[in-house]
Design a protein with these regions (language model features):
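Primarily recognizes the serine-hydrolase "nucleophile elbow" in alpha/beta-hydrolase
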Residues: 65-127
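Short beta-to-alpha linker loops that shape the active-site pocket of alpha/beta-hydrolase fold enzymes
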Residues: 34-38, 114, 168
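Short, proline-enriched alpha-helix->beta-strand connector loops that line the catalytic pocket
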Residues: 125-130, 156-159
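Acidic catalytic loop of the alpha/beta-hydrolase fold
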Residues: 137-141, 170-171
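Short beta-strand/loop motif that positions the catalytic acidic residue
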Residues: 132-134
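Serine-hydrolase catalytic machinery in alpha/beta-hydrolase-like enzymes
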Residues: 1-77, 175-189
């Protein structure tokens, strides 16, 4: 089973489409609602507020993520020890934090998700294999944060990999990023090459983590 955690806009059609793409590959996938009550917003001000409420409240984030995980586990096709999580933007930061605190996940894939955290991983706490996809033109991440993330993962003894796409900006996997960037003057943009490559690598990643015993 695979959990999909949405961007800061909420559990919208994009997040559900990503879950459907995973289902088409044969996985049981669930688009998690980290905001509650199906909240979906259409502007950065509201999105930032909702994202901050979750990001700054780890107990709440953990509870909501685990509720989604339990719902997925209740499905007859899902093995309790065979769960992975994909996260996009805000959701990328969420799934990385869930890995940091030791959730029972086989793998975590973060797509243009934040790498910094207020909850750094303790040595040998992380159970999940981790892969992070970022663009080197993403001002929300930056080389310093990538370096700090690598150091954190090394110190935690994590099995991780960081993939950096030259020229790719924040939200590179979302085809609507160009329009949203222009509308709200945000430093985001779709990058078809990075989108395709990260998805192909993520598919291989899932096959590998679910094959590992």
């Amino acid at each position: 089973g695979v959990l999909v955690v949405h961007e800061w806009w909420g559990q919208n059609e994009y997040a559900r489409r990503r879950a459907r793409m995973l289902a088409e590959l044969g996985y049981t996938a669930l688009a998690v609602d980290m905001y509650g009550d199906g909240k979906v917003v259409d502007n950065p001000t509201d999105a930032g507020k909702l994202a901050a409420e979750v990001s700054m409240n780890m107990p709440m984030a953990k509870t909501r993520f685990e509720a989604g995980m339990q719902y997925l586990l209740n499905h007859e096709t899902v093995d309790a020890n065979e769960i992975a999580a994909f996260g996009y933007c805000f959701g990328g930061g969420v799934v990385l934090n869930m890995a940091r605190i030791g959730e029972n996940l086989k793998g975590v894939a973060s797509f243009h998700g934040g790498l910094d955290t207020d909850h750094p991983a303790k040595p040998w706490k992380i159970k999940a294999r981790i892969i992070s996809f970022s663009g080197d033109a993403d001002p929300m991440i930056g080389a310093d944060k990538v370096a700090a993330f690598r150091k954190e993962m090394e110190g935690a003894g994590a099995n991780y990999r960081v993939v950096i796409y030259p020229g790719a900006k924040h939200a590179f996997s979302n085809p609507e990023a160009d329009e949203l960037g222009k509308k709200f003057n945000l430093p985001i943009a779709y990058n078809a090459e990075a989108d395709k490559d990260s998805w192909e690598q993520a598919k291989v990643f899932l096959r590998e983590v679910f094959a590992a015993k």
